[in-house]
Structure formats: structure tokens, C-alpha cells
Amino acid sequence: LGFATPSFIPKVAHVHCQGTVDHTKKRYEYRGTMSCNAAQNLFSGPNSCTYGCMGYGDCAVACPYDAIYMANGIAHVDSSKCTACGICVKTCPKYLIEIIPKHSNAYSVKCKNKWPGGQTRKNCTIGCIGCQKCFKTCQYGAITMDGPLAIIDQDKCTHCGECEIVCPTGAIVNGLMLGQDDNDQPKTTGTPRKAALKQEA
């Protein structure tokens, strides 16, 4: 009938944080309930970056598809299992998880902090410092600045990779839609905690 069929673009959950135990420090020893929401209520959590993933796995527990696992202190998404249902997005108290187009070569600013660059460097060695190098380099208008934080518009990004090249801290990464970063790290999904919660009930 002359109508074009819209192409379906699969989506996937994406965690905007790389603040593993190798890149951040602890401000204090948290001894409360092992829950992100609980830890958030105590001085925004124990990590030096108060914007980053706390690693207690509320998102992994909430995911009905076991698509989220914890490794090296932060959450990771296995896109082969993720259905982009969005439950994890609503669960994260730091608002770190976003549903984005699923592209094996996607580029992303894996950071959500809003500190000035100097403060960011003190709290996380791989965070966005707001230098604007990526913003000035992008020829396609795909990168904007939200204060000191660079943001990539996935709909405009052409995956040229220039932003990753100029990023001085490694905050911009590529190809993490497959959920295979830190594959050599021990993984834990939310399944054990789910079982424990069922037993308590």
C-alpha cells in the first residue's frame, strides 16, 4: 500500500559506571543491609564516588531474566539475556542504568558524576572530568555537555570512535553492549539473594 515498514531497533540496558574497586576507594566501611537503596541512605553510600555504582546488586536481584551480574564491585549487563524491560532502570537509586539501542559497536560515556574535573580525579580514576575534548571533536553533533558531564546521543552517533581516542581518562568506551567486559572477573547474579529472600519470606 506504499507504507514503509518501520525497522525494529533492539534495545538493551546499559550501566553508566566503570567505578570498579580498582578505580574508586571506600570512604567508610558499610555494615548495614546489603542493598543499594539502604546504603544510599547513609551518606550516599560508602564509595568515594557518590554518583557511582555501589555494587550491592539491587538491579541484579530485580532482573527477572538474570541479565545483570556483579563483577569487580559494579553491575554489568549481559545483553544476550537482557530484554530491555526497564525494571533495573527503576531499581537503581543512582539512576545509572539506561535503555539504549543495542549496537555491538556503540560508544558510551560510562559515568554519571557532576563534579568538577579535579574532584572527579580524586574520587575515580576513570570518570568524566568535563574537559569537553569529545564534545569539540565530534563532527556529528552526537555529544552534548550536561554541566561537567559529556553525554552521547545514541541516535546521532555514527560510531566513528574519535571521542574515545581523545578522552583522557578512558570514560568513553565502545562495544560494551555485549556485556562481555570483565569476563575474566568472578561473576555473581542476583539469583543467590533472590533465593535467600524467598527463604526469609
Q: What do the predicted segments below correspond to?
A:
Residues L1-T137, V166, G170-V173, M177-A201:
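Ferredoxin-type iron-sulfur electron-transfer modules and their immediate structural context
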Residues K133, Q139-I151:
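Strongly charged, low-complexity linkers/loops
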